[in-house]
UniProtKB/Swiss-Prot annotation:
Its main location: membrane. Its EC number is 1.14.14.92. Disruption phenotype: Leads to reduced growth on benzoic acid. Growth is also reduced on benzaldehyde, benzyl alcohol, and cinnamic acid. Belongs to the cytochrome P450 family. Its cofactor is heme. It comes from Aspergillus niger. It is a single-pass membrane protein. This is Benzoate 4-monooxygenase bphA. One of its GO terms (cellular component) is membrane.
């Protein structure tokens, strides 16, 4: 055998084995052969991995649907279905589908609510925190959200007064940075009982510890989170690569794996601080970590330190850059669309007392135009732009979706970005920013059902109510107290990891007197 491998025929044998490695899975899934696929997507996961590595997977998949139609095979087992009629079939209650092995790449420390694939484990984990995020319960969080937004306003007022251009009156800043500081400090306050301190210091930093007993070090949390999202989404296309990722020649993977460890270290540090006896003794707040400590593991025991930290990490990830990315996108789309900010000014000035800087949730939750602006940004920007993959598990019967029959082992997804920009669903102006489309007199039942910024079904975002409250109060504050000018050319650039995130938004900002034209 060794002689054969070392002979001239060895190369041909190796090539033949390589071809069989990719060809056999293709032949095995004969029922998927009639679904068109771009490039080598039908034969190897590396095609999708490469698109994800480049940071524009959502665009490539969208273009593939424009070329091939509603069904596109984007990996040997994975079919993307650009059909709003498939949303409930793929993500709805009672279908038995599971999160695919894509989510294995996101596991750090211990499986958490986001990346667990076991249905019973997910039910147990969700039960621990779901009541904390109910509309009835989120009122307890508002004072902490409010306090951080007040500090945000204080810092912007300071910059408006001390850094303004004397000719234009505007102070220059990257709005994305400040939305990141705000979002991280809010989730730090809600989850761990204290903000990170980014707003106060005006910079991205966080303490991390490799273990609870390790000495502290400091990292840029926003940068760490970005890199972690990119590498995890990329490795999710080929989860078997994860153990070897740091040995790959592309530094993207080495840096990304380090970011995974650093982000886990941030959660370790925050949990460690929160569990200190003197902090526990003096704590009177019901924060997310307190709720998690009330939870039980699979044996009915209190959560161990590893699982508790993993769940805290889930809350940190879910509640930070999702909010900041969306806030930044809202500012961008409002600035680039004539007339929107003026309508916001009018609506906000009428609803909020003039002597109030940061409104309460009650003051802004029933302002229709503000809500329309937020929803329209979520539609056109699609912070979660990719199709979230679901696997049909063994034992499930075949299921027909969008006219095609799928079998156990197949993976399906519905691409949010493509659905949210479909002209068939949203009309000829689907790629334009039109807040008025959310007027109940205009919005169709189909459009309402096709809007899935928080996903849908049993694995939908558990923190939706808190996220919407944050966005309403943040946007109600920012647009009422400040005026803006665009200071960058061209569209706002984005890059996709697990989320579609802006790369920056350079604007001019100055104080606005509420009630002024």
């Amino acid at each position: 055998m060794l002689a054969l491998l070392l002979s001239p025929y060895g190369a041909y044998l190796g090539l033949a084995l390589l071809v069989l490695y990719y060809l056999l899975p293709y032949l095995k899934r004969a029922h998927l052969r009639d679904i068109p696929a771009p490039g080598l997507a039908a034969f190897t996961n590396f095609w999708l991995l490469l698109q994800t590595r480049r940071g524009h997977r959502f665009v490539v998949v969208d273009n593939a649907h424009k070329k091939y139609g509603k069904l596109v095979r984007i990996a040997p087992r994975h079919t993307s279905i650009a059909d709003d009629g498939a949303i409930q079939a793929v993500y709805g209650h009672g279908n038995g589908f599971l999160k695919s092995d894509f989510y294995d790449a996101f596991v750090s420390i211990h499986r958490g609510l986001f990346n667990t694939r076991d249905r019973a484990e997910h039910t147990r984990k969700r039960k621990t925190v779901s009541h904390t995020f109910s509309m009835k319960s989120i009122g307890q969080f508002e004072q902490y959200i409010h306090g951080n937004i007040e500090l945000f306003v204080k810092q912007w007022n300071r910059m408006a007064d001390t850094q303004r251009n004397p000719k234009t009156g505007f102070a220059s800043l990257d709005a994305l940075n400040w939305f990141n500081y705000l979002a991280f400090d809010i989730i730090g306050d809600l989850a761990f009982g204290a903000p990170f301190g980014m707003l106060d210091k005006g910079k991205d930093f966080a303490e991390m510890r490799k273990t609870p007993d390790s000495p502290p070090s400091y990292v840029q949390a926003v940068e760490v989170l970005n890199r972690r999202g990119e590498v995890s989404a990329t490795l999710g296309c080929y989860p078997a690569l994860k153990p070897f990722a740091k040995y790959l020649p592309d530094s993207f993977f080495r840096d990304g794996i380090q970011a995974v460890e650093d982000l886990a270290g941030i959660a370790v540090a925050r949990v460690n601080e929160r569990l200190r006896p003197e902090v526990m003794a003096n704590n009177t707040r019901v924060d997310l970590l307190a709720r998690l400590m009330e939870g039980k593991d699979s044996n009915g025991e209190k959560l161990g330190r590893a699982e508790l930290t993993a769940e805290a990490l889930t809350q940190l990830i879910a509640g930070s850059d999702t909010t900041s990315n969306t806030s930044c996108a809202i500012l961008y789309w409002c600035m680039r669309t004539p007339g929107v900010i003026e309508k916001l000014h009018k609506a906000l000035d009428e609803a909020i007392p003039q002597d109030v800087d940061v409104p309460t949730h009650a003051m802004v939750k029933d302002i229709p135009y503000l809500q329309w602006v937020i929803w329209e940004t979520m539609r056109i920007h699609s912070t979660s732009a990719m199709g979230l993959p679901r696997e049909i598990p063994a034992g499930n019967p075949p299921v027909t979706i969008s006219g095609h029959t799928f079998y156990p082992g197949d993976v399906v997804s519905v691409p949010s970005y493509t659905i949210h920009r479909s002209k068939e669903i949203w009309g000829p102006d689907a790629e334009q920013f039109v807040p008025e489309r959310w007027d109940p007199a205009r919005l169709t039942p189909r459009q309402k059902a096709a809007f899935i910024p928080f996903s849908t079904g049993p694995r939908a975002c558990v923190g939706r109510n808190v996220a919407e409250m944050e966005l309403l109060v943040i946007c109600g504050t920012v647009f009422r107290l400040f005026e803006f000018e665009m200071q960058q050319e061209g569209p706002m650039e984005t890059r996709e990891g697990f989320l579609r995130k802006p790369l920056g938004l350079q604007v001019g900002m100055k104080r606005r007197q509420p009630g002024s034209a």
